[in-house]
């Protein structure tokens, strides 16, 4: 360089490097970029790399005090999105030194910070991130994960069953505890605080924790199975959240819960560390995710939020149902379900996986299917999610005509029937209805459930396409 030259340079001169060979230690990002009219794709891709790493809008003399070659993000490849006009996937490589170790917060502040408000872009969406092994190893990750959770609960060879307590707001603590007792008494493994339930005037958290712990212990004694209620520790401050987690540990319950997006990654990671140190499982709810991930051309895809949660820490996370009332495309959903559960995931664009991801020793997270599902969906859910999942029926348990306990019985009978049929080699996709019908001959509870929900399906066009 011939010395400092003031003025505005094109981003692509510095930040578009198509010949760059990515390093194993780089964090790689795939952005869906929609440039403003007249902005060439290379310039838009380079602008993203610049604004999310070392660059700014003009040359500054302090650039000479650092080594841009060492620290700059680079846009190393651009491809047009099939079927979309003026939309591109820009691949950006970030040197690992740009990020603080063990901080999802810092990673997101850089990669999805100011750049999303950038004027030269009409819209920007982060589709996927490749987290290098060197960075993965700086995170604790899930407090316990799939195998340890099964060992703690002594439940193997089938998905776990849960029930969200409804009505979500307005019950007193004692009545809430009664509802909590009925579900595991019938046969569900878990009950769940709704994500909106924190500590409101009609039910303060401490009262709820006490009644729920009592309910679960009672059900545990009567059924001989380990039961848990996800006690929601989400709060307005970190200190208050930790106070709730500590009280849960003092009660000896197996699991607490957190809303990781509204609570924030910093709070979530603190809670995950506490949970590992104190033997608590951590259930994660994703309230607010659709604000971030539902638009096709702007925001962050849920697979990135799922990866971030695995790094920050959680043992369960809600991840759509493919069949219920909320959104989720089958292949794409299964793509991020594998990213949550498996140790090594191959690049596969047909499932929306842009990079091969190696999680090395980071434990896996159980995906939770929840939202508008009922017994008639059980064969499909067992088929799609397999054993390592939590199937959560709120209305599908509490809405049973004979109430909550028979509702839980119906779900458990349906689940056991599907698992048995699968283990016998039957095809759940083709024979699902038949399997449920056969089982309902032996279970009046299941027969009553089938009667109520025989034909309800929530079918709309999927919005998330590749």
Curated annotation (Swiss-Prot):
One of its GO terms (biological process) is reductive pentose-phosphate cycle. It is an enzyme of class 4 (lyase). Substrate binds at residues 114, 164, 168, 286, 318, 370. Mg(2+) binds at residues 192, 194-195. The modification N6-carboxylysine is found at residue 192. Transmembrane segments: none annotated. Its cofactor is Mg(2+). One of its GO terms (molecular function) is ribulose-bisphosphate carboxylase activity. One of its GO terms (cellular component) is chloroplast. HAMAP family: RuBisCO_L_type1 (MF_01338). This is Ribulose bisphosphate carboxylase large chain. It comes from Cornus kousa. The gene is rbcL.
